[in-house]
């Protein structure tokens, strides 16, 4: 997919850079594979903000994606590649030989008419899903499971992938884009290839309103708040906050490590860079 620039006939078009979606399906999604999705405005079931700066945005239909690829040894043909407003990657509508339809994450270079399959004996081909024990070392993968049968969790956003770098003692070692090396059980499944839409990282929204369409509200600085709202708030005139940057709850921000999960740390061979 190429990037699209615009003639600056308005100020917001001057900086706007979008992904060219002319090759994607222009119709509506398959109704049987969609469901309604309600907005939370960043609030939890108590009505308290748990995700700041969320709210508004265009209405969406949720596309039900098959992350598990549990239809084993049944070949499917790619009917079309679609845009999905719920994720940065594109999705592919596939039709199995028995007539069933399904949405999967579309990898790069997957085209309409291609055949994909989930099988232990599948070819090492873009879009095919296999257990890690059946995949040769050095293969580029996406939608990798962390627990057997749970469905893919690693490398699902636009342009991402992981590399299979080793196998030992019932575990596969994968290298993530962050530089982290991680162990995953060999019976976990993964899909061949890297995720579509790698140009997503190069887009420029061009104006604040386009961010609002995506459901993001303005990000307010702590120093612009009152003392009741933030540790950096208050002061006479403009102030610098008066302390090292912290979150609204007083914990250090700006890169302090917060991960505390000893139970799964044993699966991290090398920490991210």
From Swiss-Prot:
Tree of life domain: Bacteria
Keywords: Ribonucleoprotein, Ribosomal protein, RNA-binding, rRNA-binding
Record bears the keyword Plastid: no
A single Gene Ontology CC term: large ribosomal subunit
Pfam families: Ribosomal_L2, Ribosomal_L2_C
A molecular-function term among this protein's GO annotations: structural constituent of ribosome
Any one Gene Ontology BP term: translation
Family annotation (InterPro entries): NA-bd_OB-fold, Rib_uL2_dom2, Ribosomal_uL2, Ribosomal_uL2_bac/org-type, Ribosomal_uL2_C, Ribosomal_uL2_CS, Ribosomal_uL2_dom3, Ribosomal_uL2_RNA-bd_dom
Residue segments, region Disordered: 228-273
Keyword Transmembrane: no
SUPFAM superfamilies given in the database record: Nucleic acid-binding proteins, Translation proteins SH3-like domain
Composition bias type Basic residues, residue spans: 254-273
Role, per record: One of the primary rRNA binding proteins. Required for association of the 30S and 50S subunits to form the 70S ribosome, for tRNA binding and peptide bond formation. It has been suggested to have peptidyltransferase activity; this is somewhat controversial. Makes several contacts with the 16S rRNA in the 70S ribosome.
Alphabetized HAMAP family for the sequence: Ribosomal_uL2_B
Assigned protein family: Belongs to the universal ribosomal protein uL2 family.
Subunit annotation: Part of the 50S ribosomal subunit. Forms a bridge to the 30S subunit in the 70S ribosome.
NCBIfam families assigned to the protein according to its UniProt record, in alphabetical order: rplB_bact (TIGR01171)
The protein's name in its UniProt record: Large ribosomal subunit protein uL2
Organism: Rickettsia rickettsii (strain Sheila Smith)
């Amino acid at each position: 997919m190429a990037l699209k620039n615009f003639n600056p006939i308005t100020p917001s078009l001057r900086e706007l850079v979008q992904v060219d979606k002319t090759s994607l399906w222009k119709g509506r999604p398959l109704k049987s594979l969609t469901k309604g999705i309600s907005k939370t405005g960043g609030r939890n079931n108590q009505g308290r903000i748990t995700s700041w700066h969320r709210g508004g945005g265009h209405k969406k239909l949720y596309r039900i994606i098959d992350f598990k690829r549990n239809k084993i040894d049944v070949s499917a043909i790619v009917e079309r590649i679609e845009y999905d407003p719920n994720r940065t990657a594109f999705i592919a509508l596939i039709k199995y030989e028995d007539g069933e339809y399904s949405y999967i994450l579309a990898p790069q270079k997957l085209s309409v008419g291609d055949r994909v399959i989930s099988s232990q004996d599948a070819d090492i081909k873009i879009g095919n899903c296999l257990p890690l024990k059946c995949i040769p070392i050095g293969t580029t993968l996406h939608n990798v499971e962390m627990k057997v049968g749970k469905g893919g969790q690693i490398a699902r956003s636009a342009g991402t992938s992981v590399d299979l770098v080793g196998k030992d003692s019932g575990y596969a070692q994968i290298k993530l884009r962050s530089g982290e090396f991680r162990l995953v059980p060999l019976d976990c499944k993964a899909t061949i290839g890297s995720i579509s839409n790698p140009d997503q990282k190069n887009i420029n929204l061009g104006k604040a309103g386009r961010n609002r369409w995506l459901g993001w509200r303005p990000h307010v600085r702590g120093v612009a708040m009152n003392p009741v709202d933030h540790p950096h708030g208050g002061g006479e005139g403009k102030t610098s906050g008066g302390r090292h940057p912290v979150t609204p709850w007083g914990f250090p921000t700006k890169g302090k490590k917060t991960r505390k999960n000893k139970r799964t740390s044993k699966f991290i061979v090398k920490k991210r860079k």
